[in-house]
């Protein structure tokens, strides 16, 4: 895992969210849409969160990721 890889994964996550009408997905759906491993997805979310591009909320069953 390196900075370039994390940036690439963050781009994949951003595109997956951007392609949704609601601009949000649950973690399970996001993992399926990007085909990233759990640690790759978490690193990408950390990257996007640090840049202020996403917001995370919880519902009863899943963590919801949404573009700002």
Name the predicted role of every residue range.
Residues 25, 34, 55, 63-68:
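Long, charged, low-complexity, helical-prone intrinsically disordered regions
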Residues 49-59:
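A short, conserved structural fragment
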Residues 36-47:
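Short amphipathic alpha-helical interaction segments
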Residues 6-34:
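Short amphipathic alpha-helical interface segments
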Residues 1-14, 62-63, 68:
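Short alpha-helical segments that sit at the start of domains
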Residues 28, 42, 59-60:
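Short loop/turn and capping residues at structural boundaries
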Residues 1-2, 38-40, 56:
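Intrinsically disordered, low-complexity regions enriched in Ser/Pro/Gly/Gln/His and often acidic
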């Amino acid at each position: 895992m390196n900075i370039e890889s994390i940036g690439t994964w963050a781009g994949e996550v951003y595109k997956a969210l951007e392609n949704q009408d609601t601009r949000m997905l649950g973690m399970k759906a996001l993992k399926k849409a990007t085909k990233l491993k759990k640690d790759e997805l978490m690193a990408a979310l950390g990257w996007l969160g640090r840049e202020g591009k996403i917001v995370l909320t919880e519902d009863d069953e899943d963590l919801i990721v949404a573009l700002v």
